[in-house]
């Protein structure tokens, strides 16, 4: 074999070993079906530095409280044929809150406190399990991009269950799911939305995570290419783009102590939103935990917001 042929083979092997293979592994780790951390394992040594740890007892209490209420397991078909799981807490109200959790989260862990609060505010509560998580169908998550259509599917299901007024409440990836759906809500019974700890775009979030975890920058464009090829989504699509056409009032909630999604993205999304809007930055609150970090402040502001748009 000619020397140039050997060089080409060696170069191709190097590209595969040091770029393509690692990029594929990262892609699978980020987007493939999530086996959520069981709530009981958060107290193990492995998670001793997790930001949930100081809040575990309060999360457990909220989880136990909401799960003690009568509820029905429901299923909803997605636009692309997946079966999505939900738990419906019917308190006989005319208004229903639909909750959407974050990536990698077990169905209840990062929305239990929110569900309890909303139930106490007089809402029926529908807790959803996102696609490619837990018992819901799907092999791949798209961190909000396809999930936005699931938001619409669950909205229709809530209407079928008798909801006259609907609140959408998303945390983290769930917040992005709601944000991406925010311009598609005309003609529905959705009266308002809450975007809690929402990011700006998947690509920007991955850029931050890559820097924090010392992952080479070349992996980012590789993820964009792989997402385009295999998932048919654009990781650079900003939530601010759809919020600029938002069809319902939006309450933005973010903690200044959020080390997962920068607080500035909450401000950016708020500024981009075209519909009536409110912003609450909770001093020192970690990711998705504003409602537990300062329940008096967050609760008061949210109840005031609900009072404007729900009967």
Q: What feature does the model see in each segment?
A:
Residues 285-296:
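Catalytic histidine-centered segment of alpha/beta-hydrolase-like enzymes
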Residues 180-233, 243:
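Hydrolase active-site cap/lid region
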Residues 245-247, 252-254, 258:
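Short beta-strand/loop motif that positions the catalytic acidic residue
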Residues 133-165:
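Catalytic nucleophile-loop/oxyanion-hole region of alpha/beta-hydrolase
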Residues 1-57:
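N-terminal membrane-anchoring alpha-helices
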Residues 53-92:
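N-terminal cap/lid segment of alpha/beta-hydrolase-fold proteins
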Residues 117-137:
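Conserved alpha/beta-hydrolase
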Residues 103-117, 130:
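The serine-hydrolase catalytic nucleophile loop
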């Amino acid at each position: 074999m000619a020397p140039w042929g050997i060089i080409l083979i060696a170069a191709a092997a190097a590209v595969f070993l040091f770029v393509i293979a690692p990029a594929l592994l990262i892609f699978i780790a980020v987007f493939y079906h999530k086996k959520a951390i069981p709530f009981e394992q958060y107290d193990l040594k492995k998670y001793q530095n997790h930001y949930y740890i100081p809040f575990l007892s309060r999360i457990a209490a909220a989880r136990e409280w909401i799960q003690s209420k009568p509820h029905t397991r429901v299923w909803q078909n997605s636009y692309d044929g997946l079966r999505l799981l939900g738990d419906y807490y019917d308190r006989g109200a005319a208004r229903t809150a639909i909750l959407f959790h974050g990536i990698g989260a077990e169905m209840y862990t990062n929305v239990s406190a929110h569900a309890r609060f909303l139930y106490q505010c007089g809402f029926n509560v529908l807790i959803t399990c996102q696609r490619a998580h837990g018992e819901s169908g799907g092999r791949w998550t798209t961190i909000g991009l396809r999930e936005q259509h699931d938001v619409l599917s669950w909205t229709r299901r809530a209407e079928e269950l008798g909801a006259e007024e609907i609140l959408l409440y998303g945390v983290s990836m769930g917040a992005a799911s709601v944000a991406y759906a925010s311009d598609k809500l005309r003609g529905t019974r959705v009266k308002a939305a809450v975007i809690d700890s929402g990011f700006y775009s998947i690509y920007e979030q991955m850029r931050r995570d890559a820097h924090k975890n010392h992952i080479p920058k070349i992996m980012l464009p590789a993820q964009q290419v792989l997402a385009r090829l295999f998932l048919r989504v654009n990781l650079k699509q900003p939530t601010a783009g759809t919020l600029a056409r938002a069809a319902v009032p939006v309450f933005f909630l973010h903690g200044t102590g959020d080390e997962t999604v920068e607080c500035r993205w909450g401000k950016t999304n708020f500024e981009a939103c075209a519909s009536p809007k409110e912003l609450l930055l909770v001093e020192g609150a970690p990711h998705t935990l504003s409602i537990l970090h300062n329940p008096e402040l967050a609760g008061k502001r949210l109840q005031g917001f609900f009072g404007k748009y729900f009967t």
